[in-house]
Amino acid sequence: MGTIKATNIEPIADNGTVTLGSSGDTITVPTGVTVGGGISNTPVFFVDQSNSAGQLVSAGVNTKIQFNRAIFDPSGVFDITTNYRFTVPSGGAGKYFFKTTLAVNDNGGGGYTRVSLNTAVNGTNNPYVFDNSVNTLTVTSVFTGTEVLDLSVGDYVEFFGIAYGASLHRFAGASGGWSTPALARSTSVAGFRLIGT
């Protein structure tokens, strides 16, 4: 076994490929070594419904959640103006973790009795990530679901919610910035690519 000491390793051709090891090999990064650069769980984003009045929705209807504010989205992967969806960018294929929070308000009606949350990939609905019946609620309550999706470049993910009960409900939002306590009670979604996928 030998040791190679260098400050920089590059391919012979510009934009070429450098391969370390082959199938079945193990490459070990010793304890205490910091790995920087390309190995990261990006893209990453956190968006929410910024209107404190919320998004008015009809009871029992699977409705796309209009996330219209980026708390952070350094790669610009979430459309907060038109389609309200995440799109996998070039080089971003892999498994993604999503955490969606749905804050429901009964809009002063007769309350709501069941809340569901689901995603759709390329327009096709997935099974519910959250679906629960509750005692009739008239106050704003928060429901959370998590999901891991295997996505390819160009795939887009949309987020939907349903509240059953009175004729109209609201998906509650929160005005203010990152540090506002109301953000914890706001309709939001965070997502990132899992390292190693």
Question: What are the residue ranges of the model-derived segments?
Answer:
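Extracellular jelly-roll beta-sandwich "head" domains, especially the C-terminal globular C1q domain
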Residues: 38-197
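Intrinsic low-complexity, repeat-rich intrinsically disordered segments enriched
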Residues: 1-59
